[in-house]
Amino acid sequence: MINLIKKGDYVKVDYILEVDGKVIDTSIEEVAKENKIYYPEREYEPIGFIVGNGELIEGFEEAVIGMEVGEEKTVTIPPEKGYGLRDERLIQEIPKEMFADADFEPQEGMLILASGIPAKIIKVTDDTVTLDFNHELAGKELKFTIKVRDVQPAESE
């Protein structure tokens, strides 16, 4: 009997993520090396999650529903079902003097934690630093190639 993935199932999948035609993340070591995004300290293995629990972005979880073990497909996920649209309210200009006690000099492109929240410095002037608190993939269309490796059906009630 073929088990098609449904909400509540525990699945393991391999994936390749492309943004703007460039591979930026994968669970497959060989693909990471080919695309020069390999990190030796990372474990490259299928990711496991319960479908519908909100552990991953909505579009990814929806994409695996109806798939079966061994199946591979490529899906394009719009920002609304990915990391959301960019929100201009999440861009904030703060006085540069707030960095006076920091152990670094703020520079454009730098990623920092501001009150525990990740932000990217997008502009530095003599008096101000502009921070962008949007997720780096906000507003981006995500192209995922997904291959199902394992499915554990949800426990029937």
Curated annotation (Swiss-Prot):
Going by the entry's taxonomy, the superkingdom of the source organism is recorded as Archaea
Query: Which reaction is catalysed here?
Result: [protein]-peptidylproline (omega=180) = [protein]-peptidylproline (omega=0)
Q: Where is this region: IF?
A: 86-137
Claim: Calcium is one of the keywords in the record? no
Has the keyword Transport been applied to this entry? Answer: no
MF-aspect GO terms: peptidyl-prolyl cis-trans isomerase activity
Annotated PPIase FKBP-type domain ranges read 1-95
Location in the cell: Cytoplasm
List the SUPFAM superfamilies.
FKBP-like
* Gene3D superfamilies tied to this protein: 2.40.10.330, 3.10.50.40
Name the predominant localization.
Answer: cytoplasm
What keywords does the record list, in alphabetical order? Chaperone, Cytoplasm, Isomerase, Rotamase
Transmembrane regions listed in the UniProt entry: none
EC numbers: 5.2.1.8
Assigned GO CC terms: cytosol
Q: Which InterPro entries match?
A: PPIase_dom_sf, PPIase_FKBP_dom, SlpA/SlyD-like_ins_sf
What function does the entry list?
Answer: Catalyzes the cis-trans isomerization of peptidyl prolyl bonds and accelerates protein folding. Also exhibits chaperone-like activity.
Entry's free-text remark on domains: Contains an N-terminal PPIase domain and an IF (Insert in the Flap) domain.
Record's family? Belongs to the FKBP-type PPIase family.
Name of the molecule in the record = Short-type peptidyl-prolyl cis-trans isomerase
Q: What is the native source organism of this protein?
A: Methanocaldococcus jannaschii (strain ATCC 43067 / DSM 2661 / JAL-1 / JCM 10045 / NBRC 100440)
